[in-house]
From Swiss-Prot:
Residues 1-36, 97-110, 174-202, 275-286 are extracellular. Glycans are attached at residues 2, 15. This is Rhodopsin. GO terms for biological process: absorption of visible light; G protein-coupled opsin signaling pathway; visual perception. Phosphorylated on some or all of the serine and threonine residues present in the C-terminal region. Contains one covalently linked retinal chromophore. It is found in: Membrane; Cell projection, Cilium, Photoreceptor outer segment. Residues 333-354 are annotated as: Disordered. InterPro entries: GPCR_opsins, GPCR_Rhodpsn, GPCR_Rhodpsn_7TM, Opsin, Retinal_BS, Rhodopsin, Rhodopsin_N. Belongs to the G-protein coupled receptor 1 family. Opsin subfamily. The modification N6-(retinylidene)lysine is found at residue 296.
Amino acid sequence: MNGTEGPYFYVPMVNTTGIVRSPYEYPQYYLVSPAAYACLGAYMFFLILVGFPINFLTLYVTIEHKKLRTPLNYILLNLAVADLFMVFGGFTTTIYTSMHGYFVLGRLGCNLEGYFATLGGEIGLWSLVVLAVERWLVVCKPISNFRFSENHAIMGLVFTWIMANSCAAPPLLGWSRYIPEGMQCSCGVDYYTRAEGFNNESFVIYMFICHFCIPLIVVFFCYGRLLCAVKEAAAAQQESETTQRAEREVTRMVVIMVIGFLVCWIPYASVAWYIFTHQGSEFGPLFMTVPAFFAKSASIYNPLIYICMNKQFRHCMITTLCCGKNPFEEEEGASTTASKTEASSVSSSSVSPA
């Protein structure tokens, strides 16, 4: 084994010289230089500096403006709540531990940090799945006369929290466990060992199938069908410029949504799966740290993709920030009018942009 396994930790370095110490008790500067921990802390501070205001603003603006309190926006708000979970449950903890160079908060802190970070990520992931299904049902109309109501939105919210907890809670209850990973100043699921009594293998397989592969398949299916529906509507109205514009708008949104999903999850999932299937192989502390912390940037681009590209929300946000006035009102108004025209045109072909 090219690492050192101890009680509730795994350090990716062989302890041939006796230098390896518990990541709960000693600085891990033998893994990487103190400067690397400082850079990690600075990166997390940047995510908090940007992620907290934009997600808090999303919640505040929606509460402030009644016209934004639509069933679909309930799911979008759930994304903001998930991102705030990551900010408070994971990012603040990592800043503190990276300042010390090890997981100074002990096993209880590791369990809490791992749980809240996993919960926030999973709520966000399953919120995207609910959004994809909603778009498919409303736009492609596999169920005739379906209307996404407040009850559907509430069921979607409950579903995301149930699924998120079905992934984040088991390691607290003995099915797998949370341990420090990478540079040993943040915690995640134990992909690294087959520790007796924790059944890590079965949990990791369950997590990858139910909490990665299935969501990925659902998102691709729903947005693939959405793209086909928009193209069919545009083909039926070859001379309609507004329909073509609507097709481009929906296509752009779909592409950005799928790319955001893949960019966030595939690097982390790929590295985690590699470590799980190659336990005992040699890898450095940065091998898991880089994709794990890159995935945390979802707290920034989630609201940008799913909310800030919404013209109505953008108008309300500017109005809130500018004390009730929108200095770009004429431009925003023209843009909103064009958007309504496009939506109306495409709606006649049973398609509506996001």
